[in-house]
Design a protein with these regions (language model features):
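Outer-membrane beta-barrel porins/channels
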Residues: 1, 58-364
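N-terminal, post-signal peptide beta-strand-biased segments of exported outer-membrane/organellar beta-barrel
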Residues: 1-70, 263
Length: 364
């Protein structure tokens, strides 16, 4: 997507489209409810989060710049499963918990090299902590065993983008884009502790430089008709399958292993419709939006692919002078055979300020 009144952080080449007389601020928050289902058991989890804040402006002729903070990944769950073994061994309870996340601050620039061609780059700093644990307890045994995983990240993130925009005729514009994200070692030393809760006996493992980012590739296209109808679609690939990941081995150690991760493929499509962009009636100037998405899992569980993800979203953008209030709802369904099924309902609120800060006033 390439528009002068919207910040598209997915492709830094789009920053060159920002108008020379405006400054764009975009902030967003979200709230969500997730339902976890396994067999007859159901658990609900609620949370809210500050999503992003970005600002974009014209730096030089044909050069736009963007700065901001974005989420990279978020973890938050606490789930227990109890299995009845038999009358001798009683019941076994497994509790899975996780918290934390990674965020990135970035500085990006887009340069319009030729009238149809733009290139860009995002340079970011990625940081955060993630903790996970699996605790096993039994009704017939005193000992409880916990496996605790933790890692911290403090590294860089680098993405490149290119866009080609072509006016097909008087009323239609085609935009093609592509991005590449650079994969690299994160310099993080993941830790695993195996704790016997009853006698406080702890075995600690640590792997030096054990986490990496994958190479990522994406291509997309959008069609703009009379500035009323915008249709867009994109495809992305994350090459997790080429990376090893730390895990407990069959021998009991914490080592790097292959085959735990797999390549992630994602397809998304969306529509943005405005009845009358210059109409006097507010309802005719509202942006009505709808989108669909599908993603394959990037990990295996006991040799079986994780849950596939299907998403659907709808929302609208309400113009307020030169700015825009964005309201959206999203449903995300993730499921796989013999695994937990997740249904997430999310509300997104965003406000885009588009202010004419750099206009020169003339007094006669």
């Amino acid at each position: 997507m390439r528009r002068g009144d919207i910040v598209n952080t997915l492709n830094p080449a789009s920053y060159s489209a920002v108008d020379s007389l405006t400054m764009i601020f975009d902030v967003g928050v979200s709230g969500q409810l997730t339902n976890f289902k396994e067999g007859k058991g159901r658990v609900n989890a609620r949370n809210a989060a500050f999503e992003y804040a970005v600002g974009s402006f014209r730096l030089l002729p044909n050069v736009g710049m963007t700065v901001g903070i974005l989420p990279f990944t978020s973890v938050g769950y606490n789930y227990s499963k109890t299995t009845f073994l038999d009358h001798t061994n009683g019941s076994l309870t497994e509790t899975y918990a996780g918290e934390g996340g990674l965020r990135q601050v970035f500085l990006g620039a887009g340069w319009r090299v030729l009238k149809p061609l733009s290139v860009g780059v995002n340079v970011g700093y990625l940081w955060g902590d993630i903790d996970r644990s699996v605790t096993t307890s039994s009704t017939t045994y005193i000992n409880s065993l916990a496996r605790q995983y933790a890692f911290s990240v403090s590294s860089y993130k680098l993405d490149f983008g290119v866009q080609w925009q072509q006016k097909v005729d008087r009323h239609n514009v085609l935009t093609l884009g592509a991005t590449v994200g650079i994969g690299h070692k994160l310099g993080s030393d993941p830790v695993c502790q195996i704790v016997n809760v009853s006698n406080a006996d702890t075995t600690k493992f640590q792997i030096s430089n054990g986490l990496s980012l994958p190479m990522t590739y994406a291509v997309g296209a959008s069609w703009n008709h009379r500035d009323k109808l915008l249709v867009e679609a994109d495809f992305s690939l994350q090459q997790w399958g080429k990376l090893d990941f730390p895990d407990i081995s069959s021998a009991g150690g914490y080592v790097m292993q292959s085959g735990l991760l797999k390549d992630l493929y994602q397809v998304k499509a969306g529509v943005d419709y405005v009845p009358l962009p210059m109409g006097r009636n507010l309802l005719t100037r509202v942006h009505y939006r709808f989108g669909l998405g599908y993603a394959t899992p990037y990990y295996n569980i006991n040799g079986i692919s994780g849950p596939k993800e299907f998403s659907m979203s709808a929302g609208f953008g309400i113009p307020i002078s030169r700015s825009m209030l964005n309201v959206g709802a999203q449903w995300v369904h993730a499921s796989a055979k013999d695994m937990i099924t997740e249904n997430t309902f999310r509300i997104n609120l965003g406000l885009t300020f588009n202010e004419g800060w750099f206009a020169k006033w003339k007094i006669e």
